[in-house]
């Protein structure tokens, strides 16, 4: 489980990105790069990091399911992911 502080920081960044999304798009379309530098750093979507929905783990994230590889494996073994089964060849 990730630190609560890391998860809180991520949530705050998501809110900031959402808040400034329209303003950023407007400045980028106008080519006003100085204006972009005046926005908060966390307003940039590149500062966001995909995290597991259940554990908050930032590494080993499987985008299709929105969880880490570890949680994906556990859920697949429990049969909570329809259509997913253990590979055998």
From Swiss-Prot:
Q: Which InterPro entries match?
A: Ribosomal_uS14, Ribosomal_uS14_bac/plastid, Ribosomal_uS14_CS, Ribosomal_uS14_sf
**SUPFAM superfamilies from the UniProt entry:** Glucocorticoid receptor-like (DNA-binding domain)
What does UniProt give as GO cellular component?
A: cytoplasm; small ribosomal subunit
Keyword Ribosomal protein carried by entry: yes
UniProt record, GO biological process: translation
Keywords, A to Z, come to:
Ribonucleoprotein, Ribosomal protein, RNA-binding, rRNA-binding
GO terms for molecular function, please?
A: rRNA binding; structural constituent of ribosome
Which Pfam families does this one have?
A: Ribosomal_S14
Question: Which Gene3D superfamilies has this protein been placed in?
Answer: 30s Ribosomal Protein S14, Chain N (4.10.830.10)
Q: How does it assemble?
A: Part of the 30S ribosomal subunit. Contacts proteins S3 and S10.
Q: Which PANTHER family match?
A: 30S RIBOSOMAL PROTEIN S14 (PTHR19836), SMALL RIBOSOMAL SUBUNIT PROTEIN US14M (PTHR19836:SF19)
The role this protein plays is:
Binds 16S rRNA, required for the assembly of 30S particles and may also be responsible for determining the conformation of the 16S rRNA at the A site.
Protein family? Belongs to the universal ribosomal protein uS14 family.
Protein's name in the database: Small ribosomal subunit protein uS14
- Source organism of the structure: Deinococcus radiodurans (strain ATCC 13939 / DSM 20539 / JCM 16871 / CCUG 27074 / LMG 4051 / NBRC 15346 / NCIMB 9279 / VKM B-1422 / R1)
Q: What is the lineage of its organism?
A: Bacteria, Thermotogati, Deinococcota, Deinococci, Deinococcales
